[in-house]
């Protein structure tokens, strides 16, 4: 499968617009939460931290950050306008949050502004991952952290059919590859691990045997 970059982005947008319109955003957030929560906690947010979720879906981690950092700012980006609409609806009344429809690495945000960035199941969709990771590095403050989580990766063979299943081209890297691309973007990888569910809690076997791959990078201070 080979898609032009613009076609790839548009296909991803349409997939997630459709999921939001059918209410799948809440199920996705619920299924991701056991994996994402440890990644979120690894960011060690201070009360005044600026936080960004790239590919925020309905904004569930942005709301976590708004609570954890009440004196800071919590921002979500997503390529799907429908997801952003859901995020704004579900975050109504929170004063320290904002959401933007953006096809990362294009975005309206300031550089050297964020203490922490998280992304769950996003970067392998991006046509130019190197450019996107370089932009993450520009967005982070010195010492800022980036938690990158993926379920589609080399060691998780159960995921390898997903590009054909979804109809979207994806970039497949193994754990060493994810470490390499973060380091090439200028981040120091300070942790890499797989987050697993207990077998009795896993809706699919791979969630207990392979799990989500977390690669945690940090900008030099």
Predicted regions located by residue number:
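A short glycine-rich, Lys/Arg-flanked "PGG" loop and its adjoining helix->strand segment in the class I
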Residues: 130-142
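Short, glycine-/aromatic-enriched active-site segment of Class I SAM-dependent methyltransferases
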Residues: 151-169
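Conserved class I S-adenosyl-L-methionine
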Residues: 1-44, 60-64, 83-86, 90, ...
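Class I SAM-dependent methyltransferase SAM/SAH-binding core
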Residues: 50-54, 58-106
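A short SAM/SAH-binding and catalytic strip from SAM-dependent methyltransferases
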Residues: 116-128
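Short alpha-helix
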Residues: 170-185
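A short acidic, Gly/Pro-enriched loop at the edge of an enzyme's catalytic core
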Residues: 105-116
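Conserved beta-strand signature within the Rossmann-like core of class I S-adenosyl-L-methionine
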Residues: 143-150
């Amino acid at each position: 499968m080979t898609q032009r970059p613009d076609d790839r982005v548009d296909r991803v947008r349409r997939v997630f617009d459709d999921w939001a319109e059918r209410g799948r955003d809440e199920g996705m957030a619920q299924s991701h939460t056991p994996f994402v929560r440890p990644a979120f906690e690894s960011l060690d947010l201070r009360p005044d931290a600026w936080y960004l979720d790239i590919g925020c879906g309905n904004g569930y981690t942005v709301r976590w950050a708004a609570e954890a950092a009440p004196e800071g700012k919590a921002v979500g980006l997503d390529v799907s306008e429908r997801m952003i609409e859901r995020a704004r609806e579900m975050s109504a009344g929170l004063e320290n949050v904002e959401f933007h429809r953006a096809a990362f690495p294009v975005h309206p945000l300031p550089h050297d502004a964020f203490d922490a960035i998280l992304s769950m199941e996003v970067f392998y969709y991006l046509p130019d991952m190197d450019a996107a990771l370089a932009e993450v590095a520009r967005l982070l403050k010195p010492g800022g952290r980036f938690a990158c989580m993926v379920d589609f990766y080399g060691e998780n063979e159960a995921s390898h059919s997903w590009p054909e299943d979804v109809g979207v081209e994806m970039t497949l890297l193994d754990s060493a590859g994810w470490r390499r691309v973060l380091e090439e973007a200028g981040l120091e990888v300070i942790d890499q691990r797989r987050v697993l569910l207990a077998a009795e809690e896993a809706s699919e076997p791979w969630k207990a045997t392979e799990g989500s791959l977390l690669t945690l990078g940090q900008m030099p201070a």
